[in-house]
Amino acid sequence: MHGELPSESDKNEFEEIIKNHTLLNEQIIQFYRGFRRDAHPMAMMIGIVGALSSFYHDSLNIEDPEHRMIASHRILAKMPTIAAMAYKYSVGQPFVYPVNKLNYADNFLHMCFATPTKEYEINPLFSKIMDQIFIPVSYTHLRAHETQY
């Protein structure tokens, strides 16, 4: 996020920050029920992401680099949860909460495909593929984020 590869300790610290911000406020989860079941998941995600600012008004000053970093951490941490919940809602299944002991890709797969009655066995190949998808997506968004300010 700072234009260079992190040290091992910086990487570990970043991963912990992300893992500790994966949950959504329960009131945000209620927003999903306002969407039709056949709404496109991307439309749901856009609505939910927009609603986040009403819950995190403590860090909305885009002129403050620390606020931008906090917002970046939050959106990176919460986006898999938001996306998985949009998917679960669209297919009529109960939401599955994040499990922070899992890595980023595995957690996303878990939230998408586990159910309250059946644990999802994560396929290592799918996990690797999701990692490969998430890397360029997050890099692209972060680079766009950096150039806006």
Question: What are these model-derived regions, one by one?
Answer:
Residues 43-139:
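Glycine-rich, mobile lid/loop segments that gate access to catalytic sites or pores
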Residues 14-17, 28-38, 45-50, 65:
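Short, glycine/charge-rich beta-strand/loop segments that flank catalytic centers
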Residues 2-6, 32-40, 66-70:
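Short coil/turn segments at secondary-structure boundaries
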Residues 6, 25, 79-80, 144:
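Proline-rich low-complexity regions
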Residues 140-147:
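Conserved small/polar residues in nucleotide/adenosyl-binding loops
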Residues 1-33:
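An N-terminal structural lobe/cap that precedes and organizes the functional/catalytic core
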